[in-house]
Amino acid sequence: MNIKLFTHTDLDGVGCAILAYLAFGKENVAVEYCNYDNIDLKVSQFFIKSNPGEYDKVFITDISINENLAVAIDRYAKSGLWQLFDHHQTALELNKYDWCNVLIKAPDGPGLKTCGTELFGVYLLSSEGLVNRYNWTTINNILQFIAIVRDYDTWRWTTMGRDGIVSKYVNDLLDIYGREQFIDVMFARIRMYTDADFPSITPDEFLLLEQRKEEIDRYVIQKKEQLIRARDIYGHLYGYVFAERFFSELGNRLCQMNLGLEYIVMIDICNGKVSYRTTRDDLNLGTEIAHSYGGGGHAKAAGSTFDREYISDLVVKKLFETDEMKGAE
């Protein structure tokens, strides 16, 4: 069975890739990692160029496509080839298509917010025979991994005390190891460890995590001094800072340090990305802010992208191409 997976680049998106590998075998899954600025292009190119019958299933997880692309795919989705699983409010309109499953809260349980890994996992456990592929110890590890990813992605871990810190540890390990090595580590631990041990963070990993914590603390202090206050086009008071690392931690801590600001913007000028964070309940960053700039996301955490070369050219012109220099030419 050949599987194609388009998924997001964060822990939730990577979690979906790990579940796909577990369900279908790593050798049978072709994964393409996407952001908000390239998901439509990547999916449309695949849709146009792929040969009929080349793949048995095509999944889109933890990220969504635009309406025009969904309409085109819908003509071919009746065969069950395509499936989309997302949990972002900006994607709710896609639920009108039978092959799209967009939920904000978990289908079962006490009304907790869900994530792409959980939605995809429920499908794989019920429809793709994942339960029959492994023993119950491994299944319990899979369920535990899903909960860890969900609690981090929905930021629930911050309300769980010591029980929630494992979610942050796992997300930090993704950054420490890098995507491919992290996948290998988690894939092996899910299959090999007893459920009582999973995810079994090692002493060496705890040392790396402590070093990372100290590094984040220094970075937050540095960026706190660089924060600039402004008002957006809607009149919201926000703060922005140029940053390249630790976006979730930095954004939330800057929000806590600046309660008078409605949200925090982190601009990654080198990679053409913008991250938005808030701790308030009266503002939806995904639909009210990021969506206006071609992005999307959650109520309290969202993102968008920009043309890095265009912005870099503007900065260079402002800095160096003065009237005197132009006259000298």
Spans of model-derived segments:
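Short, well-ordered alpha-helical segments in soluble proteins
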Residues: 124-131, 150-157, 173-181, 190-197
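Long, charge-rich alpha-helical interaction segments
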Residues: 180-215
